[in-house]
Amino acid sequence: MEGPYQRLPWGIWRMSISNWRFRAKIFLIVVLSLLGMGAIVAVNLANLHNELMAARKIKTQHVVETAHSLIGHYVKLSQSGQMSTDAAQAAAIEAIKTMRYAGTEYFWINSLAGKMVVHPIRPDMLGKDLMGLKDPAGKLFFEAMIDVVKKDKAGFVDYLWPKPGLDQPVPKVSYVKGIEEWGWLVGSGIYVDDVDSAFRAEVMNLGGIVTGVVLLVLLVSWWIGKNVVDGMRNATGGIRKLAEGDTSVEIKGHERGDEIGELVQAAEIFREHSLTMKRMSEERAEQRRQAEAERRSTLAGLATELERGVKSTVVTVSESAGRMRSTATGMAGAIDNASQESQAVAAAAQQTSSNVEAVAAAAEELSSSIRGIGSQVAESTQIAKEAVDAANRTDGVVRGLSEAADRIGEVVRLINDIAGQTNLLALNATIEAARAGEAGKGFAVVANEVKHLASQTAKATEEIGQQIASIQSTTADAVGAIESIGKTIGRMDEIANAIAEAVEQQGAATQEIARNVHEAADGAQEVSHHISSISRTASEAGVAARELLGAAAELAGESETLRNGVDRFLGEVRAM
């Protein structure tokens, strides 16, 4: 359903004065002011016209009352008997006929019955019936005059009446007043066109004044509007440039004392604030650049230091792992040789036991057996010496392995120290990043990565330390086993020497053959037992050597992984 405002033409209800241009608003004020002034002028002109008309009417009323007083004088003369009624009326008619005012204005008298009694200008109307007389507008004006007198005794009547010198009747207003004693009314009128002429003259004078005032108002309004609009355009243009970031703009109008001056001053404050903000922004950007440069420099230094320390450690670990692998390989080979030689010694001991039993069973073959025993004892002695040498070498290799494991332990401790220092540097970097605020967030992430890498390094070195501890334990066992092998081989050498001495004494003490054979059998049994122990120890040493070899390979792999991780981390740090 449409409201009344929606039916207004041109969508007036949608108009909002806030969307008008400032010049249009000033024009609206001027127009409204002029309309108000025009309304006031129109009211004043209407009042002026009414006042002019009222003044003429009052003047006419006064002169008619004067004429009425004159006629009244004659009425009193007739009533007092000083004059007859006819004489008094004739005297009154003569007096009224000759009376003039305002130069040409006159009076007339007609009876209340509608007959003209006297008319100085129109003598042709004397005695005529006036009741049917109409003006060009069709008004029975004499009848109206009689009605006014009968009703109110006096009053004004307007009508159209010919004016001397003019072809057409003009508006006229007459004042009439009744004379009851004689049944007359006396009247006089004024032409309204005189009032209109005077009114038009006043209108022209006032119009000239109003026109001058209007022109002055328009000129002043135009000047004020131009001053305000130019000031507003200057201020808004400067503010728009300030909003676009141009702080070099100069807005004119600081000296103004009006609201535009206040606006310009506020814009100047905004410009100074913008300059301050721009300068602060540039300073913050410079601080961020310096912080970024310092961060990059610090990261580069940390990366270089970390690279130098970690790579040195990794190289040391790799070299140590290589040496440990070589040592383990050599130890495994030596242990294998020792195992083989132990097996040979065991076979020789078994052969010796068989020979001793053969000597006990066949004494008659003692000479030949003694020679065979001598040969076997010599061979056993040689094998025992070789076993001693192999055991000594194995002992040296294992001790070298133990020393290598100790050096690896030192390297692991060095890696742990570096990881601790790296963790401490990461903690310091985290603190510095927290101090740097937003600019240090990226650095904090890097510091956390460094700390995480240090933790992984510490964990890897701990695992390496455990492996090295296991190697050291196994190496210690191998050293003990090798020492036992050495002792056993030493005892075997002593037994072999004893067998040799017994063989040399066979010729001199045959009676002690049985005892020596039993002793030789016991010695052979013991040698066989110790050789079996040596073989088991050698097998265990071989297993330990292989474990050591695997640990060395694992250590080398861990060191390579550590080096790759450090290289990748340093690459990421340098790329930031």
UniProtKB/Swiss-Prot annotation:
BP GO annotations: chemotaxis; signal transduction
Transmembrane annotation, as ranges: 26-46, 204-224
Domain Methyl-accepting transducer: 320-556
Coiled coil spans: none
Location of region: Disordered: 279-299
Record-listed Glutamate methyl ester (Gln) modification sites: Q351
Keyword Nucleotide-binding attached: no
Keyword field: Biomineralization, Cell inner membrane, Cell membrane, Chemotaxis, Membrane, Methylation, Transducer, Transmembrane, Transmembrane helix
Domain HAMP, chain residue ranges per copy: 226-279
A single Gene Ontology CC term: plasma membrane
Compositionally skewed regions (Basic and acidic residues) per UniProt: 279-297
Family note: Belongs to the methyl-accepting chemotaxis (MCP) protein family.
Protein known as: Methyl-accepting chemotaxis protein Amb2333
